[in-house]
Structures are given as structure tokens and as C-alpha cells.
UniProtKB/Swiss-Prot annotation:
The lineage of its organism: Bacteria, Pseudomonadati, Pseudomonadota, Gammaproteobacteria, Lysobacterales. It is found in: Cytoplasm. A motif ('HIGH' region) lies at residues 59-69. It is an enzyme of class 6 (ligase). A motif ('KMSKS' region) lies at residues 618-622. Its cofactor is Zn(2+). One of its GO terms (cellular component) is cytosol. It comes from Stenotrophomonas maltophilia (strain R551-3). Its EC number is 6.1.1.5. This is Isoleucine--tRNA ligase. Monomer. Its main location: cytoplasm. Belongs to the class-I aminoacyl-tRNA synthetase family. IleS type 1 subfamily. CDD domains: Anticodon_Ia_Ile_BEm. Keywords: Aminoacyl-tRNA synthetase, ATP-binding, Cytoplasm, Ligase, Metal-binding, Nucleotide-binding, Protein biosynthesis, Zinc.
Length: 943
């Protein structure tokens, strides 16, 4: 009867659970971290190390977090935790953007607009309370993601100290000469009732009426002379313009031509029974005439736009208004007519060219900008023909304006077009350019544009294309409108002279005094402040500015309000946000940083893409393809979400679906099972007693430590380069190939069958201990919960948390002069693959069942055979086969052959050996197993 030898085997044993059960296990780990004060422990443990500061771009304090928030915060957390392991002190202070319109709107829905149920002070208090509520909601979700940071002491742009530091930052901008005031055209949202910054604009498709409008010449002969022709008495001359904003025509004060563009005087359609010649860009004449129903192109003359400068035209429905022909650099001959109607109150280029020609001094404010903040024409706006414009909304009036042009013959063509048009990012409604008195940070007055472009060159950009993107944006951007006509925000704490509008000569000093008061009492102190307290007798001559600062200025000066204020220094090592922030936070921070310090506030900028479904579609409720991070955490666990984020190519759009999540859950199981197998085989291993020196290890064990060292170097470099996807691939490949398909499979025999305390078994355990120590650190930034759990099961004395350590230093490369070096193993593993290929058909045809039933013969060159001959008795363990013979051959190639064994099978180790049954007490065992359970045990050197 067979004996049961199971009790003589060292089978794996561990309490580390096979199932992650993350949704249930992670909250308990979080609670322990909270109780321990993990973040402060991390900082204390890292005290004295060099700083690495990843500065958090503040999310807006409104609503539950979405998948984009999770991507952003988890990427940051992975980087911060990798920096701790790399030997840095890596403080992470999360922040929130707390002022601005969305919060005002939320408060208005409940309490009404300012002055309805609440005065301004009460309204601001409700805004503050609402923002704090939203912060508390979001903070719970962010912490649940496993993000470790100073959650008990975050920065909030609504805190009194931050609001004060923001005013101090503005004072520095003023001191350095960057602040200007003017009635320039700015993006204006009628729903917001306020100016918008460029970062608050998004482009959407919109249908607009495209019209060609004839501006008749006041003096047809004068235009003819510019073309070198005489105009017959029965011929009218006109300059057609093309526009998609008919509502701006009441504000049309000039027509701009390109000075170097070639124009022609072409025969157009008749008007009022008279012939009409039209001034058109030569490159556009044929297309324009086709729009006007003119098939034959008849030209009467040519001239450059410069020859037409200062000619006078008639407004198409205000006959008393003289329209001057200007030369503008913004005019092109790529589309339209080559002539641009110029409304300085409703276009940036229009404003610049009109200012150059002195038009702004000639017309009053109502003529320059005839619409109010709601989009309604002012009472002073003259009628267009018989159509009353005063009191009408511009979108509604457009159709009537087109009708007037059609009736008076000025309309040459009309057709609706779909085009990309600026919209408010909050309301998703079209915006307009509208000239209003605003405060600007000038891009050129004190050389900010050039200084910012120079600063961009000093920054590392990830991905590298980010540099060109932000360069083009800064190079072409207008002045930054930093004022808003709203209630909930940091005041522009300036006093302006009632007569001249100039800011007080002691503004910088006064702003510092206001900031000190705000730090103690909050922003309401500005509105209750009696100017005489600061200005004394001058108070009667000055008034307080009531505008507030753009929220992009709030977040843009966090390098002052957080980095400098908390002693982290500037610049930060890294800013990391979504790719839309080249025009948002990266840019506002760059401009304020350069305006204040003449340098960028960051050393590196990293951007990530947006989340899309598996078909590349943006996630939305209407499509029903959205996946909420809370659902992922509740069903699969935060570590699965973190693994997906790490494995995705964040430099592009990041695809997510239930199938992708399933694949990541499978990958997680592979990593967890590898860790569990390592722990199972470390049962009973005490590194203080059993750890073998590297130079005394079995050769295969020493090699796997070498492979782990190579891998760790790659992983460290990938973390340093923020290449998380590469790390995940390296880890999965190591677990599947180096460990799963090779090392763990090969060493099972040694671990299970050799005596518990034998050097061969302790050698394998030592290698697995080194790998487990390193592996836990490798995954810790990504699988933050699992690494913490794993850390608690590793044998030996250790720090309380894996992040209190640094990259594992127990690994080392295999010396080149080792008896079996890395190159030798490469050759042997190539032979192992040959063996597998030879055995595959033998399995298929039933000649053998398992590889252990095959005996292998290797034929190699005499030199190679001589090197492998000493290994021959142990090669069967590497190949997991029957006996192996090595024979010299007259060839440089290696040949492998195999045949089924006829030897008996040992019931304990399953190897087929000639000496099975040689011991009468154990007739079913091979001699090796008999020695391992009754004698000194076998000795292994190689495998």
C-alpha cells in the first residue's frame, strides 16, 4: 500500500487572501491610514530629504467627482508616492477653486440674485458655505481613490489667507507694470452678465447668416482714380464686405482693406437701374461675383489696398455716418471679399486698427458699443431704416437688419453657414466681443509676452508637443481680461481717481494694507472699508474698484498663495493637469509667474488626455456611456481604477469600458497571485536567520535577483519619466514570463521537496524574499491599497508602511565573471525553448503526457558541451524534464532531441529515475527523495 508523503513536502502556506475583495478591504485600510495620520507620518519620515513638489491644480468646488477628476488625482498620487520611494520629501497639498459663477448660480437658484432676498454680504456668505459643502463631498471621494495628501489642511481659494495672498500677488503684478485699464473688446457672456477670459471659451458648431453687404462710395470718381480709371456718371461704386454677424453693423465705423492685397474694380450686379462696380480682392473676385449672380468677370482696373486708404464710404443704413477705408494687418484674401467691416466695440483687430486711425475719439461709447450686458441694443441706438433696434436683443434683431439691407439694395448675397463659434464654457451659449471698461494684464506693455515665451523654453513638457502648443497660444493671445462684474470673488483692491481714472500712486502699498485686513476678516472688509481709513483727506478724490478677479487669476497665483506661503519654494517641480490646461491653468500660472518673478512657476508640465469610451466617443449622459469612478470603486475597488489609469497611454485620449475594466481586473489578479505565491513559499522564512548571501545562492536564484535588479532600474527610470504604462507592462511581463513561466515553475521542486532548512531551499526563499521586497515597492505607487496589505505579510522586521522606505537595495547585478553569468543564462533559456518545441509534438501524439516523461539529449559544439557538461545532472530541473545528456558535436548549432523515458516515476517528486525502489523502506521513492526525507538531503548548485 502506498505511503502518503504529502507531510514531507514544504507546500506553500500564507494567510494573504487569494481574492482581493477590494471594495470591502480598502475602506478598512483607509480608516487605518486616517487613524495613523499617514500623510504627516510620511512627511516626518522624509524630513531632511530633498523636496519634490507636485503642485495641485485646484478642481472647481461644485458637484461629485467624475472620471476625469479620478484620472488626474490618481496620476498625481502615483507620482508623489514614487518620489517618496526615490528618496524625496514629496508634500502634496490638495486644493480647491472656490470663487466664480457656477457657485453664484447655485446660490441664486436657492436664494435669488443679490438684492432679492440677500444683500451682497449675505450672498457671499452663502457662496462660501456652498463651496465648503462641495469641498467636503469631493474630499471623501478623492480620499477613497487612495490619494494621500494633506486633506486636513488643503488650500482653498476662499480661505482668508489665500484671498489676502491673491491681493498681494496682484500688487506685485501692479508694481511690475503689467496692469492696464481700458474699454477693449472682450468675450462677453449674456448669461453670465460678465466678461470672460480666453480660458473660459469653448468652440462649438453654430449656424450664422453669412451676408455680403455693399458699402457705397461717397465719391465714385475718387475710387476710380485709385484704380487709374474714370467712372462713368451712370455707374455706382461700392466696397462689399462679408460678415457672419449682421448684428454688429449698427456698430460699423469703418471698412478695412489689406494694404498689400491686390484689388480689382469688377462689374457687379445692377442697382436701382444703374451699373455698379465693386471693389474686390483679386483672389476672391470670381467666387464673390458668383455669389452675386454675376457669371462673367469683367474687370475695369487693379490697385493695391494701400491706394484706397482714407477713401470714404456710406454706411448701408446710417446714411449720415461716414465710413473711412482703413488699412489693417488682419485682413486676408483667403475668404469673403477682402474687405472687413470694422466695429471696434466688437472685435479685437477692429479695435486695434480703429485706435490707430483715431476713430475711438470721433465716436461716443454708445456708437462704439451699442449693446448692453444683456445683449440688448441701447436706447441711443438709431433705427435701421424703419426697424427700431433700441430695446431689441441682438440675436432677434439680426433677421430684421438683413431685411433692411435687402430692401435698400445693399444686400448682395445671403446664405446660412455652419462654423466654429466661441461659446461660454458654463452656459454653452454663444458669446460676443463687447468693449467694456475692464482691467487687463497687458501682454506687451512690460514685455510679458516675450518673457513668457522665453520662460516656456526653460520648462520640461510631457508630452513634448505641449511646448509648441502653449507657445502658439501665448504668442497669439490678447491681453488677459482679469476683471469680472460679479459678486463672489476676490476684489480688485484698487482706488481710482474720480476724474482721471488713474490708480492711486501708492496702490502697491495700499493693496498690502488691504490684504492684511482681508487676511483677518475676509473679502467683505473691502466693501465695508471707508476709503478715508487708508487715504485720509484724499478719499474724496478716489473711488473703490468694485470688480472682482477672474477665477483663473485665483488659481493662477497659487504659486504665491500656496508654494511660497507654505514654504515649499518656487518653482514647483511639476504641474500635472488635463490637456485643456495649456490654455487654462498652465497658462494663467505661467503669465502670473513671469509677471511676478520673471520665471515660470514650474519646472515641468505634464498633461493627460480626456476619457472616452471604447469607440473613442466622449463620455456623456445622453450617450449613456459614462462610467462613474464611485461605481468602479464600489464594484471592483480603487486599485483596479488606479491600475487602469496607470496602464493607459495618458498622453492621448484614455479609453474605458466594462471590457477594459475586466481586462485590468484580470491583470490585477495576475499581480496578486504572483505576490501570493511568493508569500506562500516564504512560510517559515526569517530573513534574520535564513537569508543567504547573494554569492552563495544557487545560480538560478542569483540570476533571478539579477533580473529583478534590471527590472527595478527600468521601473525607476519609468517612474522618473512619468511613464506609468511602461511600468505596468514591465510588471506583468516579469510576473508572466520571468516568474510564472520560468522561475516559479522551476523552483517548485526545490522548494517543495528539499529539506526545510537546506541551503538549496533557503536560497530560493532568499531570492523570493528579495523579489517580494522589491515587488511591493514597485507596485506601491499604483496599487496603493494592495501594496499596504502585502507589506503586512512580508517576513522580517520592517517599517510601518512601505512608503517609509526607498527603492529596495537588496538587489544587485550578476557579475560578468560569475560561474553562470547573464549571457550563459540567455543561452540556456534559448535551449529550454528548443526543448519545449521538441516536446510539443510528442505530447500531441501521446508519446508523453508531461515533460517529466521525456529524456533529453543536447548536442552542441565541443566548447559549449564542455561548459554545459557540469550542469547536466541539474539541467532536468531547469527543463522540468527527465534525464538530460549533453554531447559534443561537430557543429556550432545546438540540437535537441527527446525520447520517452522507461524509468519509474517517484510518487513524491514525480521525476522518472533509475533508482526508484532502490530503498526497501521507501520502494516508491527515488534516491534523491529518500535522502531529502531521511538523510542529509541533496545539494543544488545550478538550478
Amino acid at each position: 500500500m502506498s505511503q502518503d508523503y504529502k507531510t514531507t513536502l514544504n507546500l506553500p502556506a500564507t494567510e494573504f487572501p487569494m481574492r482581493g475583495d477590494l471594495p470591502k478591504r480598502e475602506p478598512g485600510i483607509l480608516a487605518r491610514w486616517e487613524e495613523q495620520g499617514l500623510y504627516q507620518q510620511l512627511r516626518d519620515n522624509a524630513a531632511g530629504r530633498p523636496l519634490f513638489v507636485l503642485h495641485d491644480g485646484p478642481p472647481y468646488a461644485n458637484g461629485r467627482i467624475h472620471l476625469g477628476h479620478a484620472v488626474n488625482k490618481i496620476l498625481k498620487d502615483i507620482i508623489v508616492k514614487s518620489r517618496y520611494l526615490a528618496g524625496f520629501d514629496a508634500p502634496y497639498v490638495p486644493g480647491w477653486d472656490c470663487h466664480g459663477l457656477p457657485i453664484e448660480i447655485a446660490v441664486e437658484k436657492k436664494w435669488g440674485k443679490v438684492g432679492t432676498k440677500l444683500d451682497a454680504v449675505e450672498f457671499r456668505q452663502k457662496c462660501r458655505e456652498f463651496a465648503e459643502e462641495q469641498i467636503n463631498i469631493q474630499r471623501v471621494d478623492f480620499k477613497r481613490l487612495g490619494v494621500t495628501g494633506d486633506w486636513d489642511n488643503p488650500y482653498k481659494t476662499l480661505s482668508f489667507d489665500f484671498e489676502a495672498n491673491e491681493i498681494r500677488a496682484l500688487a506685485k503684478v501692479v508694481a511690475n507694470g503689467h496692469l492696464v485699464r481700458g474699454a477693449k473688446p472682450v468675450y462677453w457672456c449674456f448669461d453670465c452678465g460678465s466678461a470672460l477670459a480666453e480660458a473660459e471659451i469653448e468652440y462649438q458648431e453654430k449656424e450664422s447668416p453669412a451676408i455680403d453687404v455693399a458699402y457705397a462710395a461717397r465719391d465714385a470718381q475718387a475710387i476710380g482714380q485709385a484704380f487709374g480709371v474714370s467712372v462713368p456718371a451712370d455707374v455706382e461704386v461700392a466696397v462689399p464686405i462679408w460678415t457672419t454677424t449682421p448684428w454688429t453693423l449698427p456698430a460699423s465705423l469703418a471698412v478695412s482693406l489689406g494694404a498689400e492685397i491686390n484689388y480689382v474694380l469688377a462689374e457687379g450686379p445692377a442697382h436701382n437701374g444703374k451699373r455698379r462696380w465693386l471693389v474686390l480682392a483679386a483672389a476672391l473676385a470670381e467666387r464673390a461675383l458668383q455669389r452675386y449672380g454675376v457669371e462673367a468677370v469683367v474687370l475695369h482696373g487693379e490697385a493695391d489696398g494701400s491706394a484706397l486708404e482714407n477713401q470714404l464710404l456710406a454706411h448701408p443704413f446710417y446714411p449720415e455716418r461716414e465710413i473711412l477705408v482703413l488699412n489693417g494687418e488682419h485682413v486676408s484674401d483667403e475668404d469673403g471679399t477682402g474687405a472687413v467691416h470694422t466695429a471696434p466695440g466688437h472685435g479685437q483687430e477692429d479695435y486695434v486698427v480703429s485706435q490707430k486711425y483715431g476713430l475711438l475719439d470721433k465716436y461716443n461709447a454708445g456708437q462704439v458699443t451699442p449693446i448692453d450686458g444683456r445683449g440688448v441694443y441701447l436706447e441711443s441706438t438709431p433705427p435701421a431704416g424703419d426697424v427700431v433696434l433700441a430695446g431689441q436683443h441682438l440675436w432677434k434683431a439680426q433677421e430684421a437688419i438683413v431685411g433692411v439691407l435687402r430692401d435698400n439694395g445693399a444686400l448682395l448675397a445671403f446664405h446660412p453657414i455652419r462654423h466654429s463659434y466661441p461659446h461660454c464654457w458654463r452656459h454653452k451659449t454663444p458669446v460676443v466681443f463687447r468693449a467694456t471698461p475692464q482691467w487687463f494684464i497687458s501682454m506687451d506693455k512690460a514685455n510679458l509676452r516675450n518673457d513668457a515665451l522665453a520662460a516656456i523654453d526653460t520648462v520640461g513638457w510631457f508630452p513634448s508637443w505641449g511646448k509648441a502648443r502653449i507657445q502658439s497660444m501665448v504668442d497669439g493671445r490678447p491681453d488677459w481680461t482679469i476683471s469680472r462684474q460679479r459678486t463672489w470673488g476676490v476684489p480688485i483692491a484698487l482706488f481710482t481717481h474720480r476724474q482721471t481714472g488713474e490708480i492711486h500712486p501708492r496702490s502697491v502699498e495700499l493693496m498690502q494694507q488691504v490684504a492684511d485686513r482681508v487676511e483677518a476678516e475676509g473679502i467683505d472688509v473691502w466693501y465695508s472699508l471707508d476709503a478715508a481709513e487708508l487715504l485720509g483727506a484724499e478719499a474724496a478724490d478716489y473711488e473703490k474698484v468694485t470688480d472682482i478677479l477672474d477665477v483663473w487669476f485665483d488659481s493662477g497665483v497659487t504659486h504665491e498663495g500656496v508654494l511660497a506661503a507654505r514654504g515649499f519654494g518656487k518653482p514647483a517641480d511639476l504641474y500635472l493637469e488635463g490637456s485643456d490646461q495649456h490654455r487654462g491653468w498652465f497658462q494663467s500660472s505661467l503669465l502670473t509667474g513671469v509677471a511676478i518673478d520673471k520665471r515660470a512657476p514650474y519646472k515641468q508640465c505634464l498633461t493627460h488626455g480626456f476619457t472616452v469610451d471604447e469607440h473613442g466617443r466622449k463620455m456623456s449622459k445622453s450617450l449613456g456611456n459614462g462610467i462613474e469612478p464611485q461605481d468602479i470603486m464600489n464594484k471592483l475597488g480603487a486599485d483596479i481604477l488606479r491600475l487602469w489609469i496607470a496602464s493607459a497611454d495618458y498622453s492621448n485620449e484614455m479609453s474605458l469600458s466594462q471590457e477594459i475594466l475586466k481586462r485590468n481586473a484580470d491583470a490585477y489578479r495576475r499581480l496578486r497571485n504572483t505576490a501570493r505565491f511568493l508569500l506562500g513559499n516564504l512560510d517559515g522564512f526569517d530573513p534574520a536567520q535564513h537569508l543567504q548571501p547573494l554569492d552563495q545562492m544557487v545560480a538560478l536564484d542569483r540570476w533571478i535577483v539579477h533580473r529583478a535588479w534590471e527590472l527595478q532600474e527600468k521601473i525607476k527610470a519609468a517612474y522618473d519619466g512619468y511613464n506609468m504604462a511602461e511600468i505596468v507592462q514591465l510588471l506583468l511581463n516579469f510576473c508572466s514570463v520571468d516568474l510564472g513561466s520560468l522561475y516559479l515553475d522551476v523552483t517548485k521542486d526545490r522548494l517543495y521537496t528539499m529539506p526545510t532548512d537546506s541551503s538549496g531551499r533557503r536560497s530560493a526563499q532568499s531570492a523570493m524574499y528579495h523579489i517580494a521586497e522589491a515587488f511591493t515597492r514597485w507596485v506601491a505607487p499604483i496599487l496603493t491599497f494592495t501594496a499596504d496589505e502585502l507589506w503586512g505579510y512580508l517576513p522580517g522586521e520592517r517599517a510601518e508602511h512601505v512608503l517609509f522606505t526607498t527603492w529596495y537595495d537588496g538587489l544587485a547585478p550578476l557579475p560578468a565573471d560569475a560561474q553562470l553569468n547573464a549571457a550563459d543564462f540567455d543561452q540556456l533559456l534559448a535551449v529550454r525553448e528548443q526543448v519545449a518545441k521538441v516536446l510539443e509534438p510528442m505530447r500531441a501524439n501521446g508519446a508523453i503526457g508531461a515533460a517529466l516523461e521525456a529524456e533529453i539529449t543536447i548536442a552542441a559544439s565541443e566548447e559549449q558541451a564542455a561548459r554545459w557538461q557540469p550542469l547536466a545532472d541539474e539541467l532536468r530541473f531547469l527543463f522540468i524534464s527527465g534525464d538530460v545528456q549533453v554531447r559534443p558535436a561537430t557543429t556550432d548549432e545546438v540540437f535537441v532531441s527527446a525520447q520517452p523515458t522507461t524509468k519509474a516515476k517517484c510518487v513524491r517528486c514525480w521525476h522518472h529515475r533509475a533508482d526508484v525502489g532502490s530503498n526497501a523502506d521507501h520502494p516508491e521513492l527515488c534516491g534523491r527523495c529518500v535522502s531529502n526525507i531521511t538523510g542529509a538531503g541533496e545539494v543544488r548548485s545550478w538550478f
